[in-house]
Structure formats: structure tokens, C-alpha cells
């Protein structure tokens, strides 16, 4: 029986914790209207939030919905600011508890990890596997429509496997079941959803690593890669994975799942070899297209140098993690900044 944790609620609803949660939720958003409104009567609002939680009267408010297009179109549902304070208060207490049960090679939305740590681990594993086997193959997969597919009942059961504090479970139930989705789906844009998405695949991680004994496995949110010396081994494994995801988690793999030689593995936004890393080709095409458009916009006076500098800095930030000096120079050469007379 897995260990379950109690005596967490007092920490969640403590005034100091809610105050810290307000500051975390307000970071880089201090001048938004909803943040200013909460801050105008800060102590009163913290106490009100505290009372709503203590008396089990809190419930999620309506989400703000919008689309973003970076790197691809995504539908975002952002909770109101007061809800984000509650989310921070919960996550700050329960996340360390769930962290103890997560595997080392899960990298998304975790302190001390992240996309570049995942990329480095993937390269390290490719290098190790090549030394061990010579020829290496990779199973590269991701979950189809992951956030909209997360089953509420399965997710809540995962909370009960780790948490026994009834008050914390009440709050988790409110967030999971009353955020505007029926039976399945969690909002992209909520802090709690990042934790829930990691929790949801933790049992899968342990099944891969502990039960199947797979060493070379790396996951970043719903993207994962597995290395093997044989295509046939990976094909058999793929069938097992598909069955496990359907039966245990009500999930399906993206049809674009591939099994290919581990040369230029496309993972976490880069193409990874044992000895070097290059930018993803489609990312470069997109940047070149944007830079050409930006040259025209600058020439006609529609954007200024500050706008250009911000986009160039973003591109250089992406490129600094790979071996792409000549590529960087080639892309920047396409950016021509000249005003029309």
C-alpha cells in the first residue's frame, strides 16, 4: 500500500501561506485589474479566501478563455485571480508530497528540471545507449489531446492514493470536478493543471521504469522517448503502452508516434545526436518567415527597434542551447533593418 499523507490542511489555509500565494500569483501581473482589486484590500481578501476554504464554501469562478499561437494554436482557460491564489496555496503544500513519488526522468513543470534538463538527459541516454549497443532506435511518442483527455475519476483516485487529509481532498475535488469540464479535461492555464498532468502519468512512469525495467526513458509532460537496440522490441513495447494507456488512464497515443534510428532525435524543440544538438527544422522555417515579415514591418514603420530586439533575443535564447553558430548567422543575415524613405 503506498504511503498516504495527512495533516496538510492547516498549512494550506494558513494566513502566511495564502499571503505568499497571493504574491506568487501576482508576480509579473501586479498592474492587471483583477490583481489590483485583490491587492486594494489585501488583508481582508486573504481572510475572506481563508474563511471560504476553512468552511468549505469556496468554489471555482468562471474561466477567461482565449487562444495563443506560440508555438502552435492552443486554447487557454485562465482562472480568475482569486482562484489562482487558492491554486498556489494548495500546490505549495501538496506538490512536495507528490514530488517524492515522481521518477527522476520526468522533467516538465518541476523545480530544478525543465525543457533543457530533459534535452540534456535525452542526449546523455542516446550517448550511453550507443556505447552499449552500437545501433540505437527510438520510440518517440506523445499523448493525443492530453489535457482535454484527463479523466476526472482517475485523477481524483490518484490524489487519494497519496493524500488522506479529507479537507485537502475536498479542495482537490472542487478544482477537478467543478472547473467547467464534464467527466474529463483540465484547463490549460491553471497552475493546478500542471501538477495534475504530472501526477496523471506518474503511475505510467513507474510502470515503464519499474515493472518493464526500461532504463532509457525520458518524459517531458506528455512527450516521451524510449531507446532500444531493436525496432522489433520497440514495436512490441508500443502495443503494450497503447493497451496500458487505454485501460489504466483512458488515454491514446498520437497517431504520429514513430520508431526510427536514434539520429537527430526530435525532442523538446531540438534535434539531438550523441555528439551535438541542432535546432528543429520547422522552428527555423518559422523564424525565417517571421524575420522576413519583421523586416518589412520595420521598413514601413509598423514596429520599432524594441520590438525587433525582443524577437531577436528570443531567437538567440533558443539557439544558445544547441550547436548552431552558422545557422544563427544565416538566419540573422535575413533580418534587414532599413526604413523606407
Q: Predicted regions span which residues?
A:
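Conserved two-metal-ion catalytic palm core of "right-hand" nucleic acid polymerases
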Residues: 1-155, 163-164
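Right-hand nucleic-acid polymerase module
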Residues: 6, 79, 88, 178, ...
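Conserved polymerase palm-domain catalytic core
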Residues: 45, 52-53, 105, 123-221, ...
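PAPS/PAP-binding and catalytic site of the sulfotransferase fold
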Residues: 89-93, 238-241, 245
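Beta-rich nucleic-acid/ligand-interaction surfaces
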Residues: 109-117, 225-227, 260-264
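A common structural junction motif
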Residues: 163, 242-251
Amino acid at each position: 500500500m503506498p504511503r498516504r499523507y495527512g495533516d496538510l490542511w492547516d498549512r494550506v489555509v494558513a494566513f502566511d501561506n495564502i499571503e505568499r500565494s497571493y504574491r506568487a500569483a501576482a508576480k509579473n501581473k501586479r498592474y492587471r485589474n483583477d490583481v489590483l482589486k485583490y491587492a486594494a484590500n489585501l488583508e481582508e481578501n486573504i481572510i475572506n479566501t481563508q474563511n471560504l476554504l476553512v468552511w468549505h464554501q469556496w468554489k471555482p469562478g468562471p474561466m477567461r478563455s482565449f487562444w495563443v499561437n506560440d508555438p502552435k494554436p492552443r486554447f487557454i482557460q485562465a482562472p480568475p485571480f482569486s482562484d489562482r491564489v487558492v491554486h498556489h496555496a494548495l500546490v505549495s503544500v501538496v506538490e512536495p508530497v507528490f514530488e517524492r513519488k515522481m521518477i527522476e526522468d520526468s522533467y516538465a513543470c518541476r523545480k530544478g528540471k525543465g525543457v533543457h534538463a530533459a534535452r540534456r538527459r535525452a542526449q546523455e541516454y542516446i550517448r550511453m545507449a550507443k556505447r552499449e549497443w552500437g545501433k540505437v532506435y527510438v520510440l518517440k511518442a506523445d499523448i493525443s489531446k492530453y489535457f482535454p483527455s484527463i479523466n476526472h475519476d482517475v485523477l481524483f483516485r490518484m490524489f487519494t492514493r497519496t493524500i488522506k487529509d479529507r479537507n485537502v481532498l475536498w479542495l482537490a475535488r472542487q478544482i477537478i470536478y467543478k472547473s467547467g469540464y464534464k467527466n474529463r479535461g483540465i484547463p490549460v492555464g491553471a497552475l493546478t493543471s500542471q501538477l495534475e498532468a504530472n501526477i496523471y502519468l506518474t503511475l505510467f512512469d513507474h510502470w515503464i521504469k519499474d515493472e518493464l525495467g526500461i532504463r532509457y526513458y525520458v518524459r517531458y509532460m506528455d512527450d516521451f522517448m524510449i531507446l532500444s537496440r531493436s525496432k522489433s522490441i520497440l514495436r512490441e513495447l508500443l502495443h503494450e503502452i497503447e493497451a496500458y494507456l487505454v485501460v489504466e488512464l483512458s488515454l491514446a497515443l498520437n497517431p504520429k508516434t514513430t520508431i526510427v534510428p536514434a539520429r537527430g532525435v526530435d525532442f523538446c524543440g531540438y534535434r539531438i545526436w550523441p555528439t551535438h544538438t541542432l535546432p528543429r527544422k520547422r522552428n527555423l522555417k518559422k523564424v525565417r518567415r517571421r524575420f522576413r515579415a519583421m523586416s518589412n514591418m520595420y521598413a514601413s514603420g509598423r514596429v520599432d527597434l524594441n520590438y525587433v530586439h525582443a524577437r531577436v533575443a528570443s531567437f538567440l535564447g533558443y539557439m544558445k542551447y544547441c550547436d548552431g553558430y552558422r545557422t544563427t548567422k544565416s538566419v540573422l543575415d535575413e533580418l534587414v533593418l532599413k526604413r523606407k524613405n
